[in-house]
């Protein structure tokens, strides 16, 4: 199990990009933290492992 924003989810084995796609999130507008560390967008092909704690932060434009 992977914990995503505090909720357990069976996402181990997915890459970060696959996870974002499954959640209908836009990678360019989503910051990803794994284990409390910000993941650079260049590493979004990283595979999630059992026990990873992931936080997703979406950005919305506006004015």
Model-identified regions with their sequence ranges:
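Ubiquitin-like/PB1-type beta-grasp interaction modules and other compact soluble beta-rich domains
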Residues: 1-62
């Amino acid at each position: 199990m992977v914990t995503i924003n505090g909720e357990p989810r069976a996402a181990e084995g997915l890459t970060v990009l696959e996870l974002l796609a499954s959640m209908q999130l836009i990678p360019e507008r989503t910051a990803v933290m794994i284990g409390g560390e910000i993941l650079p967008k260049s590493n979004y092909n990283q595979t999630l492992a059992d026990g990873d704690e992931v936080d997703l932060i979406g950005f919305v434009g506006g004015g």
